[in-house]
Amino acid sequence: MAHVTSVTLGEHLTGFVGEMIQSGRYGNISEVLRDALRLMEAREQRVQHVRDMVLAGTNVPVSHRLMDEIFSAAVKDTSV
């Protein structure tokens, strides 16, 4: 369900939104803002995924192998 909201944009963002509409990429301000919010939501989901992976990694024992050894092993594992 749509919700009417009022936003205040500075000159720079107002100009940018206008350029996006003039380019024909978007039909109106609402389309620009919806796309921007979808991109922001996707970025936040990626950031949260990375945070979750980091937290999961804190429970893994520390490896004393050098990075070169780890990379070499990874290359061998993926060689066909």
UniProtKB/Swiss-Prot annotation:
Does Protease show up as a keyword for this record? no
The organism's place on the tree of life at top rank: Bacteria
InterPro entries annotated for this entry?
ParD (IPR022789), ParD_sf (IPR038296), Ribbon_hlx_hlx (IPR010985)
Provide a Gene Ontology MF annotation, just one.
Answer: toxin sequestering activity
**Can you tell me which residues the record assigns to a coiled coil?**
none
UniProt keywords, alphabetically: Plasmid, Toxin-antitoxin system
GO biological process terms, alphabetically, are:
detoxification; regulation of DNA-templated transcription
**In its keyword annotation, does this UniProt entry include Signal?**
no
NCBIfam families found in the cross-reference section? antidote_CC2985
Q: Which family does it belong to?
A: Belongs to the ParD antitoxin family.
- Function recorded in the entry: Antitoxin component of a type II toxin-antitoxin (TA) system. Neutralizes the effect of toxin ParE.
Q: What is this protein's record name?
A: Antitoxin ParD
Q: Which organism is it from?
A: Yersinia pestis
Q: What is the lineage of its organism?
A: Bacteria, Pseudomonadati, Pseudomonadota, Gammaproteobacteria, Enterobacterales
Q: Which gene is transcribed and translated to give this protein?
A: parD
